[in-house]
Amino acid sequence: MLRLLCIAAFITFAPAAHATSAKQMEINRKAVAEFYEFAVNKKDFEAAAKFLGPRYVQHNPNAADGPEGLKAYVAFLREKFPDAHSDVIRVFADGDYVVQHVHSVLTPGSRGNAIVNIYKLENGKIVEHWDVIQPVPEKSANENTMF
């Protein structure tokens, strides 16, 4: 009987858990999109910081951990690359992770970089960040674009 009750409970509540998960993934996707726009394109640390969780672990070896590390990066962009702009080409959300494929141009007219950002979120807030950055080459071994 207990086994039958467990199966019935699973059948009843599993769709609701999945719907919540899909809803949370959309919340996470939107949070990362707004965070990135404020931090990188608008260079507004205060607005971007609202999307950070109680901790912010930075896995890029060239960037410091925590909100202060992000604040320093945003200030660097604002000072050295005020015209920098990034276009988010695609976004994937999977559970508590959001992945962005980005074309970043620090200096207008340059080819820029292809970037993949990976964010981990908890309760809708960003708590970890990884990235991989590759310069867009002048020539390619194939006819495909990086984007």
For the regions a protein language model found, what residue spans apply to each?
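Low-complexity, intrinsically disordered terminal/linker segments enriched in charged
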Residues: 131-147
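Short, solvent-exposed coil/turn segments at beta-strand boundaries
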Residues: 48, 93-97, 119-127
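Sec-dependent N-terminal signal peptides
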Residues: 4-13
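A solvent-exposed, acidic/Ser-Thr-rich amphipathic alpha-helical stretch
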Residues: 45-94
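Short, surface-exposed coil-to-beta transition loops
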Residues: 84-87, 111-117
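Short beta-strand segments that buttress and anchor functional surface loops
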Residues: 100-107
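Short, low-complexity N-terminal intrinsically disordered segments enriched in polar/charged residues
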Residues: 15-50, 142-147
